[in-house]
Amino acid sequence: MKTLGEFIVEKQHEFSHATGELTALLSAIKLGAKIIHRDINKAGLVDILGASGAENVQGEVQQKLDLFANEKLKAALKARDIVAGIASEEEDEIVVFEGCEHAKYVVLMDPLDGSSNIDVNVSVGTIFSIYRRVTPVGTPVTEEDFLQPGNKQVAAGYVVYGSSTMLVYTTGCGVHAFTYDPSLGVFCLCQERMRFPEKGNTYSINEGNYIKFPNGVKKYIKFCQEEDKSTNRPYTSRYIGSLVADFHRNLLKGGIYLYPSTASHPEGKLRLLYECNPMAFLAEQAGGKASDGKERILDITPESLHQRRPFFVGTDHMVEDVERFIREFPDA
């Protein structure tokens, strides 16, 4: 049985940014995930369910667990003195860690994706993304350090809190998964070099918004529902409403996750920096593909911390199909 810590040290030589700092950074995220796991499991017994009464910068009502997870991860990262600053979906601006100007890395995160599902005991997750800063080491970080395209990521991953808690990550050398053993307090390797199945047959989208979707996406959904034995259609529809949970299932089983633009969210709803980029990095490392329908997600240069983007991610041929439908059936 190999632990996450042992695996990270063993694999350091495989990537160009191998440093003790990155190992310690991933260890800090691991600690934050353990704390969140513990408190999610007893959320119904203590007063951390439901809305906090506050809103985040996007105008969305923050759940109590959103704020809890944000603070715990922030504290775990700051305590190691290896991160110069963070950007979070739950923070209006970047958070500069005083006294950590010497650090090489910045972290972007969605502390608790799908937190509205907690009240009904459905899987949620944590998403993280790590970059090397671009401003000189020894100076405070600036927003420039965070507004980098996804192809500059050093590492990315997620933790899914479900029937078991799993941490999945990449440093650009494949995707690896670890299951948390609460009796031992360690994450143990369960899958190495994960790959999307070559053929997918699941599509994940909130079809309740169908009337608001672009024409190409509507056509693609109909394509998924048509019967064609040569392409194993109709596909199966599965939608949890938690990006991490939907992505994880499709990674294991083969499929596509779709969150297109809508009439009410013409720029899309998912955040480029906190959700799209890390999941796109993982997808490509697992042999999949990620797109906004027209452009590779990892090639997009962000313009603002909380920028949104349409998002299509999963098995490569399925993402290519939806891109083709968007090209062939543009909105009038």
From Swiss-Prot:
Chief localisation class: cytoplasm
Pfam family, one: FBPase
Broad enzyme group: hydrolase
Catalytic reaction equation(s): beta-D-fructose 1,6-bisphosphate + H2O = beta-D-fructose 6-phosphate + phosphate
GO MF entry, a single one: fructose 1,6-bisphosphate 1-phosphatase activity
Membership in a protein family: Belongs to the FBPase class 1 family.
The name this protein goes by in its record: Fructose-1,6-bisphosphatase class 1
Species assigned in the record: Citrobacter koseri (strain ATCC BAA-895 / CDC 4225-83 / SGSC4696)
